[in-house]
């Protein structure tokens, strides 16, 4: 198939080996100008150190580094948290939530520089190619999309390193890379290496942020979270931005080994993959939000929020962020979160984050009605009529079966 003709491409650039190869490869194979776009989603200063110089030395004409940290947490993480989304019951969607904010910013840079194409470094095996290209389709259907991993014949790190060496392009990457990692403000994921066999227990070097829970402090630590409309607005009495609150809780949780999971998940493309994910601050925040929900949501609202969480987890994981259904699901969750206001104390100890105290001005919990002692506000005799009506369909079914 003949290649499309493009003049200027904006590539999502990380500074790693793959994207360092993509820049000269695009120039050689498409005879185009390449602009590097770097998204700062909280992956850390070390990851961003010297990234602009790397991009330019690889052949990029320009390099844009865009700070997306606050937008990522405020506009992508919290709306997802309000749904209660856990993919397949465990995964807090750290990589999945980051892709749409990155793709959106990449499109904005493309518009700014007058590019006619977008490129990414996602492999043909993973979920991210779908997430990026799904976002591009929704936000910039007029732009061409180039996925080098689906076109080139470079199939190993050695081949990529040789490619750069032949062109005298400097690269600090090593020949051996044990793990594949992805980090942002919300989490860090580790895949590959020893984890490729499900019979291998994770090595300690599979974990990056968190201490081994067995080696965590022997004394519990408590953090107090103030929640307003389903979002953390203060921690330990200090008002914080969404990103700063997450950063603070990441540090607290990591110290106590909170937020580790080792899972095998179903990828969108059909295969299963295994990963070790660390989400210390996010685990604390989710525990706090669910604790307040227990106080303020009535039974049917809580059931509906759980249904929203399951649907949202698949929409986000599957790269359907910029769709009407995702917007509708999140709008419903946002409506339920209006009364999710309160204060929660979370105990951090040996890998666990547990809500030990909670209160809310919107609480539906009444000590007068909930007491197990003598009370004067609840007439127990009223329960009989309710139960008879509640079980009426079962009674009718049984009587009908007895007649047959």
UniProtKB/Swiss-Prot annotation:
It catalyses: L-citrulline + L-aspartate + ATP = 2-(N(omega)-L-arginino)succinate + AMP + diphosphate + H(+). Keywords: Amino-acid biosynthesis, Arginine biosynthesis, ATP-binding, Cytoplasm, Ligase, Nucleotide-binding. One of its GO terms (cellular component) is cytoplasm. Pathway: Amino-acid biosynthesis; L-arginine biosynthesis; L-arginine from L-ornithine and carbamoyl phosphate: step 2/3. SUPFAM superfamilies: Adenine nucleotide alpha hydrolases-like, Argininosuccinate synthetase, C-terminal domain. InterPro entries: Arginosuc_syn_C (IPR048268), Arginosuc_syn_N (IPR048267), Arginosuc_synth (IPR001518), Arginosuc_synth_CS (IPR018223), Arginosuc_synth_type_1_subfam (IPR023434), AS_cat/multimer_dom_body (IPR024074), Rossmann-like_a/b/a_fold (IPR014729). It is an enzyme of class 6 (ligase). It is found in: Cytoplasm. GO terms for molecular function: argininosuccinate synthase activity; ATP binding. L-aspartate binds at residues 123, 127-128. It comes from the Bacteria. ATP binds at residues 12-20, 39, 121. One of its GO terms (biological process) is urea cycle. Its EC number is 6.3.4.5. The keyword GTP-binding does not apply. PANTHER family: ARGININOSUCCINATE SYNTHASE (PTHR11587:SF2). Belongs to the argininosuccinate synthase family. Type 1 subfamily. This is Argininosuccinate synthase. It comes from Vibrio cholerae serotype O1 (strain ATCC 39315 / El Tor Inaba N16961).
């Amino acid at each position: 198939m003949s290649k499309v003709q493009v003049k200027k491409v904006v590539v999502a650039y990380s500074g790693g080996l793959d994207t360092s190869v993509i820049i000269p490869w695009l120039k050689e194979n498409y005879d185009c100008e390449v602009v590097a776009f770097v998204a700062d989603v909280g992956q850390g200063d070390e990851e961003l150190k010297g990234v602009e110089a790397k991009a330019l030395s690889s052949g990029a004409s320009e390099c844009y580094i865009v700070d997306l940290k606050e937008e990522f947490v405020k506009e992508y993480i919290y709306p997802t948290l309000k749904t209660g989304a856990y993919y397949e019951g465990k995964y807090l969607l750290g990589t999945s939530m980051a892709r749409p904010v990155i793709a959106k910013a990449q499109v904005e840079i493309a518009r700014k520089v007058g590019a006619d194409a977008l490129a990414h470094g996602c492999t043909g095996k993973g979920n991210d190619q779908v997430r990026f290209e799904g976002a591009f389709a929704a936000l910039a259907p007029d732009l061409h999309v180039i996925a080098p991993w689906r076109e080139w014949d470079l199939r190993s790190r050695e081949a990529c390193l040789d490619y750069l060496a032949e062109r005298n392009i400097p690269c600090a990457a090593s020949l051996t890379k044990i793990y594949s990692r992805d980090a942002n403000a919300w989490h860090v994921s580790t895949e590959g290496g020893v984890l490729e066999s499900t019979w291998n227990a994770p090595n300690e070097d599979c974990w990056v942020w968190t201490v081994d829970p067995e080696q965590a402090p022997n004394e519990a630590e408590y953090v107090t979270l103030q929640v307003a409309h389903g979002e953390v607005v203060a921690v330990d009495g200090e008002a914080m931005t969404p990103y700063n609150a997450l950063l603070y809780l990441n540090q607290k949780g990591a110290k106590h080994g909170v937020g580790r999971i080792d899972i095998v998940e179903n990828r969108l493309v059909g295969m299963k993959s295994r990963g070790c994910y660390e989400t210390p601050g996010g685990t604390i925040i989710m525990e706090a939000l669910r604790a307040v929900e227990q106080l303020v949501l009535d039974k049917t609202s809580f059931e509906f929020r759980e249904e929203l969480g399951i649907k949202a987890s698949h929409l986000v994981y599957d790269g359907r962020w910029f769709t009407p259904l995702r917007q509708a699901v999140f709008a419903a969750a946002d409506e339920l979160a209006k009364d999710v206001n309160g204060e929660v104390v979370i105990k951090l100890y040996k890998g666990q984050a547990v809500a030990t105290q909670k209160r809310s001005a919107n609480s539906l919990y009444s000590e007068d009605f909930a007491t197990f002692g003598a009370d004067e506000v609840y007439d127990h005799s009223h329960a009989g009529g309710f139960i008879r009506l509640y079980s009426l369909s079962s009674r009718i079914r049984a009587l009908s079966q007895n007649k047959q």
